[in-house]
Amino acid sequence: MQRRHFLKNAAAALAALGLPTLPQWALAAKAVGLRRLGQPQPFDYAWLKGQARELANAPYKSHKQLLPGPLEALNWDQYQSIRYRQDHALWADGNGKFQAKFFHLGLYFHTPVHIYDIVDGKAQQLAYDPAAFDYGRSGLGGKQLPKDLGFAGFRLNTRKDTDRDFSAFLGASYFRAVGKEGQYGQSARGLAIDTGTGGPEEFPDFIAYYLEQPADDSDTVVVYGLLDSPSVAGAYRFAITNGDVLLMDIDSALYPRKAIERLGIGPCTSMYQVGENDNRMDWDWRPEIHDTDGLAMWTGGGEWIWRPLCNPPHLRFNMFVDENPRGFGLLQRDRNFDHYQDDGVFYEKRPCLWVEPKSGWGKGSVQLVEIPTVDETFDNIVAFWNPQAKPQPGQELLMGYRLYWGAQPPASSPLAHCVATRTGLGGIVGQKRSHFSWRFAVDFAGGELAALAKDPKAKVEAVLQVSRGTTEIVSARPLHELKGYRAMFDLVPPDEGTQQIDIRLYLRANGKPLTETWLYQWTPPPPSERRIY
């Protein structure tokens, strides 16, 4: 599948969107009018893993289907007008804190998803019912649709706010969530396969979801997912706890059908078009356009790393080798509306997504893929964990991790952190330039920097390394407006070539690091385009 087409469609669609006197099964069906198929069957996670193992032992069969003509013909506005009726919401009749609603098939979503309700340890499939949907401007109101059509996915909301969902699962293995800001942004996926290899990328599908009815006083919704693709089948358990920072506690069991070249665990998918450090696509009236502005990593060795994102001229792939990482994620650190000026999509409210392994993941690497884009509806940034050992057929790969969605990740360094990266033409103001150089200004705040900025005797220095070229005009000076420091340097690229240059920077005093490590990758322009004005 063409990644650009798939991700543009998926991103846009996800952005839209007393004591009973009867047995609970009967009460739920009667109260919300949900039709059910078959009889309730015993269910647990071990059974679901068995189902995934059976899938992996059989040849893969595509789950996509040809939709009825009226659904195939829907345009974007028509599909967006279809809404699930509140009076048919799952668990709407009870006293619990949560409800679930379902997405209709159509437009880009051709893979039917079977959805089950779990009550008292037994699962029963929920039937598609045209009466459960308000078809709005879609033109489907009077059309007959198959009773076994199925759903495209689901969304969760609280009983106190039935109009705004806090999590949604829709399209392939994509899902999203929000923190207290209530603004969707980047997405997560169940699995990434062969992302950024240069060949076709594989997008596994969740083909079934099992939603466990929460206890009335529970703050957590438990969802199970069955995943399938040509390369792998898998079983997932999501424990979703809503809050200011939404937590997803995830267990997954993967069963490869064949060897996988590049397996991505805990994949985060985001968008970066233009920002302070990268204005290659700066024709828009808004100064910055991005869901996230950097990749943060807390390595197994305890180092904190910040890698600002870019919209590169060509596909860019980076791997950060590690062992037993403590966490990583795509973050939106810049929370200033004035830096975005978009009062429609509110980029300053987009959630960070932090991935925290629950146990040792062994050797591997955090991998970052950056893809050129001219369109903010295309998710062009992907970050994930890639195990060093390539999965083989017949193996069981068990991975447990937590996802945190919100304005701030749960873990933070005691050291100062990077708050801004800016770049531009180098040289000394007022003096004629004799050669081309590129200026980097990196701002740090937090930690001990506020106190050091007030101390005239403080000796703070920038520790700088580059893989190619030379550096000049290197400095580190207090930036009182931030109660921090600004590191500045000019990078002079080699005379020939446009090979990428890796940069590493941090601040220290008396031999002790004061900041997280700032990493960057810069592609110098061709010599013919190196204007010095």
UniProtKB/Swiss-Prot annotation:
Keyword Signal: yes
GO biological process, one term: beta-glucan biosynthetic process
SUPFAM superfamilies in alphabetical order: E set domains, Galactose mutarotase-like
Cellular location(s): Periplasm
Gene Ontology molecular-function annotations: carbohydrate binding; catalytic activity
Pathway: Glycan metabolism; osmoregulated periplasmic glucan (OPG) biosynthesis
Modified how: Predicted to be exported by the Tat system. The position of the signal peptide cleavage has not been experimentally proven.
GO cellular component, one term: outer membrane-bounded periplasmic space
Cleavable signal peptide: 1-28
Record carries keyword Signal: yes
Broad class of where this protein is predominantly found: periplasm
Keywords linked to the UniProt accession: Periplasm, Signal
Any Pfam family matching the protein: MdoG
Role: Probably involved in the control of the structural glucose backbone of osmoregulated periplasmic glucans (OPGs).
Similarity comment: Belongs to the OpgD/OpgG family.
PANTHER family: GLUCANS BIOSYNTHESIS PROTEIN (PTHR30504), GLUCANS BIOSYNTHESIS PROTEIN D (PTHR30504:SF3)
Name of the molecule in the record: Glucans biosynthesis protein D
Record lineage: Bacteria, Pseudomonadati, Pseudomonadota, Gammaproteobacteria, Lysobacterales
Recorded name of the encoding gene: opgD
